[in-house]
Amino acid sequence: MILPADPIFSQLLLIARNSPDEVVIDDRNLHVQAGYSHLLHDAVQLAQQLRDSLSQGPSTVGSAFIGILAPTSYESTVASLAILAVGAAGASLEELAYTLKQCSATCVLVGSQHQQTKLATQLQEQTGILKLAIPVLSPGRPPIESYTLDEDSIPSDDLPAFLFFTSGTTGAPKGVLHARRYLYAKFSVQQSELTDELCLIYDSICWSTCFISVLLHILRGERVELHELDARYDLIWDRFRDCEITKIHFSPTSWYTMMKVFQERISKLPEPSVQAYIRGAQYIRTPITLGGILPVPVKQFWLNLRGGRPIKVIYGSTEAGLLTVADPEASASEEASIGSPAPNVTVKLSDGDSGELLVKAPTLLLQYLNSPELTASCFDSEGFYKTGDLVERQGKNFIFRGRYKADFFKFWDHKIPRLHVESCLSSLPYIEEAHILPVADARCDNRVAALVRLRQDHTCVTLQSIRKDLSTMLPVYQMPTLLRILGKGDEVPRTFSEKVAMKKTVERFFPRWNNDHFMDDSIEVLGIKEILQFDTTGPLELVELW
């Protein structure tokens, strides 16, 4: 059994020789418990099927895109390793039609949940793309000693490895092509045996995050437990209570929802039961937030519940990978600190100690798929990638101020820092959930719209009362001029990475006939004449936004 002599398979074999059969992936959805020997055997079997079925040599196969039609699972991990073994690039088909339009996949690897579905049948009938089933715990597993590394087959670090898509928060998702070096850079320290770490991964996290996360955990000798919980956060809490999980990655939305489950359900249980859940939350060594900034009330809740130990903040992007890591002090800060640069990451700011964050890292994208001009435009003359994020340097750490285009908008000639206004709104004691949105108005460019959910014991909240309460925190021009209160069943539209889908949210909650007349009577509006009564011409920091 011959494998490429690259860092990925070298590391897998190193751990497998010391811990061949110990469970490294516990897939609760497929009821599969597998060790490194199972992973290698299934991946090698699938890699050989790929070569045989395509009737081409490995070098030709290696130039192809191979689709993966499977949720995050043991199967998707096997598929990923098989694709890497033949030197091809994997592409998730979670957005099937869009992905197939963007890349010419030569084959699709299909998980058991999709093999008999209408989607898989249509895929083969309408596209003619070869479809292969992903093996699970194949019989005839050989001893680990039978695997060898082919020193004459070392893939280039820059060989395409996988295709991801951006979240689509501000527009159509973009195909981001990454090289093998993206993975190589993430496990530079070799681990020779299985550790006692156990990471819980559930299906609400976006596919690209899970893809990287599962592979990296097993390459680091860390066990992975996979769940299809369908946003059943009460079940995640129950798993916390068992005091076995040591690592978990959540988006800010998930940390918020977990907080609400504790406050509304768990906290009302008998005290011994409550303490059992608290011990479980404190047992986790590395709770991580990624994909956004935690609101201060959420950050404070977890800090208190975990006895002064904060949720760890990391920052990165689909295009650039992990860029900064916050230490405990920065993670606990009420500022939107994203910490300091991760290893092997070089940064600079466009305006000295503030401005757009520009980075160099081995994890940077190869290219935007089918977009050479866009790819060229996202690098400066020195080869730094333009993240589009505005930050400010404070000592060794960076403070996140928002996305250059998505988190700042114009109100007349003024710059509205959406995240800052949202943070102030969230801090009001009667606000449970808060969103600040730009609603277009030809007379002033954009209105500042507040979309909020109230705490259960507060009902008499108006636009004027909110503006009054914000008056000590914000200048007049940053205060909301539109308000809509979310009802019990109202849910804010989100992308697959759990970020707020801004355009859809505005369309759903602020539909209108014209500038001052909205289609829903529950929207409270401050008329343009009332706005003009305020002095909006005071000393301001004016910047060119676009």
Curated annotation (Swiss-Prot):
Keyword line: ATP-binding, Ligase, Nucleotide-binding
Pathway(s): Secondary metabolite biosynthesis
EC number: 6.2.-.-
Top-rank taxon: Eukaryota
UniProt-listed Pfam families: AMP-binding
Annotated InterPro entries: AMP-bd_C_sf, AMP-binding_CS, AMP-dep_synth/lig_dom, ANL_N_sf
Positions bound to CoA: W412, D413, H414, L482, L483, R484
An annotated GO BP: fatty acid metabolic process
Annotated GO MF terms: ATP binding; medium-chain fatty acid-CoA ligase activity
Residues the entry annotates as binding ATP: 166-174, 300-305, 403, 499
Similarity comment text for this entry: Belongs to the ATP-dependent AMP-binding enzyme family.
Role played: Acyl-CoA ligase; part of the gene cluster that mediates the biosynthesis of oryzines, natural products with an unusual maleidride backbone. The two subunits of the fungal fatty acid synthase oryfasA and oryfasB probably form octenoic acid. This fatty acid is most likely activated by the acyl-CoA ligase oryP to give octenyl-CoA before the citrate synthase-like protein oryE catalyzes condensation with oxaloacetate to form tricarboxylic acid.
The protein's name: Acyl-CoA ligase oryP
Species annotation: Aspergillus oryzae (strain ATCC 42149 / RIB 40)
Organism lineage: Eukaryota, Fungi, Dikarya, Ascomycota, Pezizomycotina
